[in-house]
Regions:
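Catalytic cores and adjacent flexible loops of soluble metabolic enzymes
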Residues: 1-250
Length: 250
């Protein structure tokens, strides 16, 4: 696993303390990432309290989310599409110039793409040009099906040179299938959780997705000798979270 997103150090004391403890732990391969949002409307990135906490956090990588759907830009942010692009650009540039590696999550991307393809692509390009190493396309409400995910991600990877990631939810029971479709269409970064633990109906189950992609489709994601640890890890997480793995694949 390349990145472990450990929480939002700005949101609560427990997450902040977790990052303090993680600073003392050396991992063999994985990199710890913090999570937060782009700057608020009406203030600079330098003055945004959430971004300042991400800048000061021990994690070298910051994952930040921003808007990609004009409906939310107008109704939730209360700003213009142009200002939203500036918010994304300035937030990423601020973190990058302060030594952070940045992954940008394009929230509700697929809804935004269906509503306005050109603007959604502008969001992707803006984030990448500002310094984001990956731009993650988020099916935030879990309403997409694999065929449309494949079609849209294929178009994005053909039209841009941006390293694309995928983030899916299981509200339609399609999180793993949509994630696999995105990889087959050219996505190079997968977000998910062990056993699919997550809000509402859950996220893509990494244990299932990794096994399916590597064992069934031939992608090399983890060392062969690490494959048996997927089951061990899934059972350990199930015990900690008190969520049964009965009936889950592998």
């Amino acid at each position: 696993i390349d990145y472990i997103e450990a929480g939002n150090p700005y949101s609560n004391i427990k997450d902040a303390e977790l990052f303090e403890r993680l600073a003392c732990i050396k991992l063999k391969h994985s990199r710890i990432a913090s999570f937060g949002s782009t700057r608020k409307v009406g203030i600079t990135a330098e003055k945004d309290p959430g971004l300042r906490v991400l800048k000061e956090c021990s994690a070298e990588t910051a994952v930040i989310f921003g808007k990609a759907w004009k409906l939310h830009i107008k109704e939730i942010l209360g700003t213009t599409p142009e200002e939203n692009l500036a918010i994304i650009r300035e937030s990423i540039e601020y973190l990058c110039k302060n030594g952070k590696k940045v992954i940008f999550d394009a929230e509700h991307f697929f809804d935004g793409y269906k509503a306005d393809k050109e603007y959604a692509i502008k969001v992707i390009r803006t984030a990448h040009e500002a310094g984001a190493e990956y731009v993650v396309l988020c099916d935030t409400n879990g309403g997409s099906f694999p065929a449309e995910i494949y079609e849209i991600v294929s178009e994005i990877t053909k039209e841009t040179d941006v390293p694309i990631g995928i983030h899916t939810h299981d509200d339609s029971g399609m999180a793993v299938a949509c994630g696999i479709a995105a990889v087959q269409a050219g996505a190079v970064h997968i977000q998910g959780t062990i056993n699919g633990v997550g809000e509402r109906c859950g996220n893509a189950n990494l244990a299932t997705m990794i096994a399916n992609l590597q064992l069934k489709k031939g992608y090399q994601l983890i060392p062969e000798e690490s494959m048996p640890t997927l089951t061990e890890t899934a059972r350990a997480i199930a015990e900690i979270s008190n969520i049964s793995t009965t009936g889950l694949p592998y």
